[in-house]
Regions:
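Sec-dependent signal peptide cleavage junction
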Residues: 21-38, 44
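Non-catalytic propeptide/linker segments at domain boundaries
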Residues: 37-189
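Bacterial N-terminal signal peptides
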Residues: 14-22
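Surface-exposed substrate-engagement region within the catalytic domains
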Residues: 65, 73-76, 80, 87-88, ...
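Substrate-binding cleft of extracellular glycoside hydrolase catalytic domains
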Residues: 179-313, 320-321
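Bacterial Sec-dependent N-terminal signal peptides
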Residues: 1-14, 29
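Generic low-polarity alpha-helical segments
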Residues: 19, 27-30, 137, 241, ...
């Protein structure tokens, strides 16, 4: 999942998300990176308000393009951060040099899953094809003069749950806060401003976050199975409870099959109980974070039927543990590929996507997230 860089002052950065009261998640920035500053009524975005999209990664307006892409990076590789790409075989390469990356903190070991946020230093990033990145780099070179000029005019913008770079925006509908696409089509009404957080944000000042307009949180509990919980999960949960901030949970999957997802589900239940989180404590769902993961010696599934079994096994483990408020989280291209299954679509309640409008339209309920 996708969390932000740590810009620490009073609190640290967090991804801005908006949710409907019926529990839909709508990132105002498709995971907007922000810093919660001293002024409790504002969010200070860490992006340039005049950032030229020609210098940004495709589908990731806040991620900078590399200056070049190595000839060793194949077109069918997947770019997973500003400087890393993954081959179809699962090898991780440096985008600019083409060298294979073996750092266990980034790729894990045969028996140990890495922290998925380590590849991006905790920042938001939606995986994109290397072919698209190469095309974007070529275009960027042609516009390098204009881009350089644009960067000189950069400023920090203050906004309270801004819209995204493509025209999707906040507004009102039936006298409640709502989120719209660039054509003013309603995506979610009764929306709430929510942040997605993990240990990468350090010790968040939750009182200031609440005073600054944060209306809820999705807290990372952990990833894979057999790993420690997120180092700040207990603190974040306790603070949200103390201050009356509604919260949900997310868990990043490394499952290759239903056996792995069942272990992940059992791990989620165990840690929820360990941290004193009952089903009634969760105002937002427990999200199963399904992405194209990277783990040495292992490769993620590509068959939707396999993923369907993975999702059903995870759901079964959570439901057996008494947790019924569940949802799938992913991004558009993955949902249109390995997750292209009617049952998974029916369970999908949060989709990360940059752009002027939501391309995924198969939400099973009205509670949904962008």
């Amino acid at each position: 999942m996708i969390s932000p860089k740590s810009l620490m002052k009073i609190a640290t950065t967090a991804s801005v998300v908006a949710m409907t009261v019926s529990v839909a998640v709508v990132p105002a920035y498709a995971m907007q990176d922000i810093a919660i500053e001293d002024t409790p009524s504002s969010f200070a975005a860490t992006v340039d308000d005049v950032q030229n999209s020609s210098n940004s990664m495709p589908d990731n307006p806040n991620a900078t393009l590399p200056e070049t892409v190595s000839e060793n990076i194949s077109d069918d590789s997947t770019v997973v951060s500003e400087n890393l790409a993954v081959t179809p075989e699962g090898d991780v390469q440096n985008i600019e040099t083409g060298e294979t990356v073996t750092d266990a903190q980034l790729v894990g070991t045969q028996s140990q899953q890495p922290d998925p946020l380590a590849k991006t230093n905790g920042e938001s990033f939606i995986p994109v094809s290397a072919s698209n990145v190469k095309d974007a780099v070529e275009q960027s070179v042609k516009q390098s003069v204009e881009q350089s000029s644009s960067k000189n005019g950069a400023t920090v913008k203050l906004a309270k749950f801004d819209g995204n770079d493509y025209g999707a925006h906040w507004g009102t509908y039936n006298n409640t806060k709502a989120f719209f696409d660039y054509r003013n089509n309603l995506f979610a009404q009764q929306a709430k401003g929510v942040i997605d957080v993990s240990s990468w944000q350090g010790d968040i000042d939750w009182a200031k976050a609440k005073a600054g307009g944060v209306e809820g949180a999705i807290i990372r509990l952990g990833f894979g199975w057999g790993n420690d919980a997120d180092a700040k999960a207990q603190r974040n949960i306790n603070e949200c409870k103390r201050l009356g901030i509604p919260f949900g949970i997310y868990w990043y999957s490394y499952a290759e099959d239903a056996s792995g997802s069942r272990q992940e589900g059992n791990d989620v239940v165990s840690k929820l109980r360990q941290f004193g989180v009952s089903p009634n404590d969760l105002k937002y769902p427990v999200y199963y974070d399904l992405e194209s993961w990277t783990w040495t010696g292992h490769t993620p599934p590509t068959n939707p039927n396999v993923y369907n079994g993975i999702v059903n096994a995870w759901y079964g483990a959570l439901q057996s543990g008494g947790y019924q408020n569940l949802g799938v989280y992913s991004y558009t291209s993955y949902l249109q590929g390995p997750l292209n299954n009617a049952n998974i679509y029916a369970k999908t309640r949060w989709v990360a996507q940059y752009g002027p409008q939501m391309e995924f339209t198969a939400f099973g309920t009205n509670d949904r997230g962008w």
